[in-house]
Amino acid sequence: MKINLTQLTQYPVPVRLVCFILALLFLWLPLAVPIYLLVKDTNLESILTLVILYVEFIFLLNIWGKQVYQQPKIFSHYGLEFTRLNGVNVLQGLAIGLTTVLVLFGLEGVLGWLIWQQPQVFLGRIILEGLLVGFGVGFAEELLFRGWLLDELQRDYKLNIALWIDAILFAVSHFIKPLEAIIHTLPQFPALVLLGLTQVWGKRWRRGRLGLPIGLHGGLVWGYYIINVGQLTKYSGQVPDWVTGVNNNPLQGVMGVLFMGGLAWWIGGQQVTGNGEQGRV
């Protein structure tokens, strides 16, 4: 008996999301469980399970688009276009994200809140590693949150409601961890919501393309990776850590929130709605 998956479109978005997640788990668990049981290296275990999860996520998206929405080019619908223009948007986003991080740390250095240090490792390797990590994180999270999830939300809700739900779920997803770790990192929640808003506005600014959000997300991760892994800074202690960032995480400090707020305000003012109208949505 052939199952008519197009009937899922008649159900509200929470039901569709649950069905998709259950299908993904059904595909992932048979491969993930043996890895958890047999692989002793925790780093290798995490890498293998995450790679398998994301490969199956992309595989399932293709089926979801064809069988549920009758859209054979679902990735283009999400804004993942392999075009020159989208590539330029990725580079623009990388530049904006990297510049934002460098300006934040540069300003704190000028104010005497941190001290710049000589790198403890070969900086060229860190820069290349950071670029790869940043692009990987940006691609994965933006296809998930500003591609699939945002599309599902916008099918049922008005644009501004979908915007806020997407941003909040994006922030909440970073707290799927033990309670102690949640409490430890909770101060970064406002900055993550602002980043989620920024990414949706960035996609709308570029008329639904994912290039800018992928690049911007990647650039932020890239910049922080270079400074953090390269051990380029040391806080002077002239101001409390809630100003510069609790646990040395700029997203957990007032300065990080202010910078993310400024970035959100700027990109939100630039974004273009699907109707070509300027302004925040």
Model-derived segments and spans:
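Juxtamembrane helix-loop-helix connectors linking adjacent transmembrane helices
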Residues: 2-5, 36-49, 72-143, 150-156, ...
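Alpha-helical transmembrane segments in multi-pass membrane proteins
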Residues: 16-70, 80, 88-93, 126-129, ...
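Hydrophobic cores of alpha-helical transmembrane segments in multi-pass inner/ER membrane proteins
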Residues: 55-64, 132-139, 196-197, 254-267
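Membrane-interface helix caps and helix-loop-helix hairpins in membrane proteins
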Residues: 113-120, 176-184
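Small-polar-interrupted transmembrane alpha-helices in polytopic inner-membrane proteins
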Residues: 133-134, 138, 159-175, 193-196
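Membrane-interface helix/loop boundary segments of multi-pass membrane proteins
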Residues: 140-165, 201-209
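Central hydrophobic cores of alpha-helical transmembrane segments
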Residues: 162-170, 211-223
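C-terminal membrane module of polytopic membrane proteins
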Residues: 218-279
